Regions:
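Soluble periplasmic/extracytoplasmic beta-strand elements of cell-envelope proteins
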Residues: 35-38, 69-72, 162-164, 178
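Acidic/histidine-rich, surface-exposed loop or edge segments in extracytoplasmic proteins
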Residues: 37-42, 173
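Residue-level signature of catalytic and energy-coupling elements of molecular machines
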Residues: 36, 44, 132
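C-terminal cap of thioredoxin/glutaredoxin-like
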Residues: 119-199
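Structural alpha/beta surface segment adjacent to cysteine/selenocysteine redox centers
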Residues: 32, 40-123, 195-198
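A short beta-strand-turn-helix
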Residues: 17-34, 62
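N-terminal targeting signals for export/organelle localization
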Residues: 1-18, 178
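Alpha-helical scaffolding within the catalytic cores
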Residues: 21-22, 54-56, 150
Length: 199
């Protein structure tokens, strides 16, 4: 557990977060008093297992009920991986508003060769292939991916997945804790329930 930092306004719980939520995949109400920032790598087996076996229940019980807000930084502790096409593809899927719908597919093809990877994602009926092609050539996408890696580095992660959890109390004070690794559903449920009980 890390020392709490004061949020400037209790009514706006995103104030004081360790990373920016703008222009990244986010689910949940912005009034939630618990905000999770997940650092995830598409080539990480534990990350994939978490999203297949744990996240759906957390999404149903905590995110969709307005208790928890969930944001994702797609990165790793290896800076050289930022040049992998999978991260740009994820960014472009997000720009078309289809990140969450394509998440399982991105995990399943992440280890393929870049040219094959792009072709497979472009075939998705959820995406506009023309927009995807334009997006992948947009320098701002590469800049956004690099920024994701920079933010992950500032959080000093030592592996993926890592979950940075912020909790706001009624007086606007923020406390921060970290969960490392793809823990069980029960582990996350206990952690969230304990945080949500705090005033």
């Amino acid at each position: 557990m890390f020392p709490g930092t004061a949020a400037s306004r209790a009514a706006e719980p995103r104030v004081g977060l360790p990373v920016e939520l703008t222009d990244r995949p986010v689910l949940g109400a912005n009034t939630a008093t618990v905000v999770v920032v997940e650092i995830s790598n598409f080539k990480c087996t534990q990350c994939r297992n978490f999203h297949e076996n744990v996240f759906p229940t957390l999404r149903r019980d905590y995110i969709e009920t307005g208790k928890v807000r969930w944001a994702v930084i797609n990165a790793s502790d290896d800076e050289s991986e930022q040049y992998g096409k999978i991260f740009s593809l994820a960014r472009c899927a997000h720009r078309q508003g289809k990140y969450w719908e394509l998440l399982d597919g991105l995990f399943s093809v992440a280890h393929r060769a870049p040219s094959v990877l792009e072709a497979l994602v472009a075939k998705s009926p959820l995406l506009d292939a023309g927009e995807l092609e334009i997006c992948l050539k947009d320098r701002s996408v590469r800049t956004a991916v690099a920024k994701d890696f920079e933010q992950a580095a500032r959080l000093k992660i030592r592996g993926t997945p890592t979950f940075v959890i912020s909790k706001w109390s009624a007086d606007g004070t923020r406390t921060e804790s970290t969960i490392a690794g793809a823990q069980s559903l029960e582990y996350f449920q206990r952690a969230f329930d304990a945080l949500l009980k705090k005033p």
